[in-house]
């Protein structure tokens, strides 16, 4: 996963830079979401990855998926990906693009994993602290993961704050076995 993200990041940055320059970040966002969903569809992906398909034919398939929403710039982007055998990266490119878009809008998407459901007050306290830490507006989504035992894991982009009992026990185990 990290390797795919590393490969996808330059493409996402280039797409975002171009879209920002053209004032078309939302159009590109929509196109990348549709393309990402298409690549994740098993039947479409199986057809797309047939060895006899040329990169140009692969791009034509995506043109059918996007229909009228496909601009020449998106077509050129798909051609670049197809020529470099990188169409499989579209979900990661779309995710990274959305992250860049959020950063540009001074917004950070945060996932809080908690061993127990958070109260509205706890969620608001965490949100306020995270907004102060990131100096941005924070959009919070909470996931309950009982396997953490206690505490929380906070994920914001590529940053992870792990204050879970599971993590602390794992560190203790490592020290004892060393």
Curated annotation (Swiss-Prot):
Domain of life: Bacteria
UniProt GO molecular function: proton-transporting ATP synthase activity, rotational mechanism
Chief localization: membrane
A GO cellular-component term linked to this record: plasma membrane
Alphabetized Gene3D superfamilies for the sequence: N-terminal domain of the delta subunit of the F1F0-ATP synthase (1.10.520.20)
Claim: Chloroplast is one of the keywords in the record: no
Subcellular location as annotated: Cell inner membrane
Membrane topology listed for this record: Peripheral membrane protein
InterPro entries: ATP_synth_OSCP/delta_N_sf (IPR026015), ATPase_OSCP/d_CS (IPR020781), ATPase_OSCP/dsu (IPR000711)
One Pfam family in the UniProt entry: OSCP
Keywords of this entry: ATP synthesis, Cell inner membrane, Cell membrane, CF(1), Hydrogen ion transport, Ion transport, Membrane, Transport
Annotated HAMAP family: ATP_synth_delta_bact (MF_01416)
Protein family according to the UniProt entry: Belongs to the ATPase delta chain family.
Subunit and partners: F-type ATPases have 2 components, F(1) - the catalytic core - and F(0) - the membrane proton channel. F(1) has five subunits: alpha(3), beta(3), gamma(1), delta(1), epsilon(1). F(0) has three main subunits: a(1), b(2) and c(10-14). The alpha and beta chains form an alternating ring which encloses part of the gamma chain. F(1) is attached to F(0) by a central stalk formed by the gamma and epsilon chains, while a peripheral stalk is formed by the delta and b chains.
Biological role: F(1)F(0) ATP synthase produces ATP from ADP in the presence of a proton or sodium gradient. F-type ATPases consist of two structural domains, F(1) containing the extramembraneous catalytic core and F(0) containing the membrane proton channel, linked together by a central stalk and a peripheral stalk. During catalysis, ATP synthesis in the catalytic domain of F(1) is coupled via a rotary mechanism of the central stalk subunits to proton translocation. This protein is part of the stalk that links CF(0) to CF(1). It either transmits conformational changes from CF(0) to CF(1) or is implicated in proton conduction.
Entry protein name: ATP synthase subunit delta
Taxonomic source organism: Acinetobacter baumannii (strain ATCC 17978 / DSM 105126 / CIP 53.77 / LMG 1025 / NCDC KC755 / 5377)
Gene: atpH
């Amino acid at each position: 996963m990290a390797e795919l993200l590393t490969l996808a990041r330059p493409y996402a940055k280039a797409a975002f830079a171009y879209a920002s320059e053209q004032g078309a970040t939302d159009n590109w966002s929509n196109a990348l979401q549709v393309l990402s969903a298409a690549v994740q569809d098993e039947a479409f992906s199986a057809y797309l990855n047939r060895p006899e398909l040329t990169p140009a034919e692969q791009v034509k398939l995506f043109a059918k998926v996007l229909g009228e929403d496909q601009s020449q710039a998106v077509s050129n982007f798909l051609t670049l990906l197809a020529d470099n055998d990188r169409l499989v990266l579209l979900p990661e490119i779309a995710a990274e693009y959305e992250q860049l878009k959020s950063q540009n809008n001074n917004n950070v998407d945060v996932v809080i994993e908690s061993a127990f459901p958070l109260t509205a007050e706890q969620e608001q306290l965490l949100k306020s602290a995270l907004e102060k830490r990131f100096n941005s507006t924070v959009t919070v989504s909470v996931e309950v993961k009982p396997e953490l035992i206690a505490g929380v894991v906070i994920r914001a982009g590529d940053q992870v704050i792990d204050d879970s009992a599971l993590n602390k026990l794992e560190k203790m185990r490592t020290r004892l076995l060393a």
